[in-house]
Amino acid sequence: VKPRIAVIADSPDEHWPSMDLVAEMLVSEWQSHFSSEVETEKLELPIPHVTRAVRDSKAALNVDRILGRFVRYPALALRERSHFDFFHVADHSYAQLVHALPSRRTGVYCHDLDAFRSILDPAREPRSLPFRMMTKTLLAGLQRAAIVFHSTRETGRRLEKFVAPHKLVYAPYGIAAEYKPDFDPNDGADEALASLNGAPFILHVGSAIPRKRIDVLFDVFARLREHMPELRLVQQGGALTAEQNDQARRLKIDAFLLQPPKMPRTTLAGMYRRASAVLLPSDAEGFGLPVIEALACGAPVVASDIPTTREAGGEVTSFAEVADIAGWVAATLRLLETGPDGRVQKARVTHAQQFSWNMHARVILNGYLSLQSPQ
């Protein structure tokens, strides 16, 4: 009998593209290529509109998010616990759900350790007592799970300090079909980039949260423009803070910064293909999906020299130390001045092709099949 596995996804109202992607790809692969072995269904809920009904503010949204994660989602888990053979919590920041599910039949995908930093490294991320109590609930849920998946060897190594090693399974991400080197005049990128009027640009894909180091990105771009005044910066996915906007104005780069609205994967792939370089200056990443997406499109990449992006980018990616502005400028200029190279581009694409959502889905399915008790 085929097992029934529920994939519990983040609320779509969270607007975390990478988390939405991993849940989408897993369900899609299981339904498209593994339907003879598994039945699956994605479970997700909107963020409740409770506190915001009284006062619409960021603080109210955060309260509603907590209500969603710690009240509505656990209630959903309790209702569904008898309807599936296994439960896959697609994002570790929802690991509190393990407490409402049969732990021996529940797994969690741990993408990074950021959600646990306030208790694992309180000096680096001091938080309030209520926040730390919620975080402890998350960590306890992760530890209770029967199986914990992770995307990089480095994350697995760090997880071994507080999760039983026999529970850990390495299941790296994949590349969506849209990310490929073939030029497509109908991908929508030309329209999205029309205001650049054909100027060369560097691309950053990701949010504007602190660990993404938008400050470094802006400093590097300002220095690059001293060498290449025609250069532009395209940032996709970040809602800039007042401080970041102030920095852009102070550096006099705000007029050369383009932030298109959220684009479909087809258009984002076109933006990767047209970019002179893709930069990822984060000081921490669970994996660094933009690295392999860009490489799959043949784009040159400069990433922070941290273990996880080293794993993702391999020898076909350029690296610079975190926040070393001069190092970043030098590494990026080398790529910009070298120009396109068919042999190097092919090597990038070949490297990226080792990452497969099909294999990702296969590994995760095998993990749950291994939990099945003999009948």
What are these regions (language model features)?
Residues 1-375:
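Carbohydrate transferase catalytic cores enriched for Leloir-type hexosyltransferases
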